[in-house]
């Protein structure tokens, strides 16, 4: 069964703060964040296509700056769109017709492991749709105007991660039915389309770098691993 990997790297990194580079392109312990996010897929024999979406004005810069890994891994660099879903859609349009499964992964999740990739791929083969996630452990409060209005039961709540992996026809149909629906990930689109999404329990260390504190934590976890 053939898999395509889509790395989403076209975001604005607005919550990360002032840096010369966007967070996927920063050096993290000797490697760019996006390449660390990709590496666990490279050991999967069924991965036959790799695409990364970047901002249109960064396409040439990306290909030039990261020429060695782009060439070595035959990475297709796709111009992104105005929003994340537009960027992923552009990449989906470029997926080879012989691909059976598509994995969408945040380029800012550099601590993904090959073990998690393998587990999610296996679940997608069985269920058609699968994501990694970890259980919510903190107490959650619903707050309105600075006041707690509800303590939210957390027993059935999970933090969704990526790579979110789907049978090709399922993901494409879910995207086709989006109609500007404000989903926050691919799994929500697939749920809305009507196909159940299987959850693979994975460690919380598969974090997404959103702030500089997240980056510092990723550095610490890599140094201590």
Predicted regions located by residue number:
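Short, high-confidence coil segments that cap the C-terminus of an alpha-helix
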Residues: 47, 99, 125-129, 195, ...
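Conserved N-terminal catalytic core of the sugar/cofactor nucleotidyltransferase
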Residues: 34-99
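Short beta-strand-to-loop acidic/aromatic patch adjacent to the donor-nucleotide binding site
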Residues: 98-109
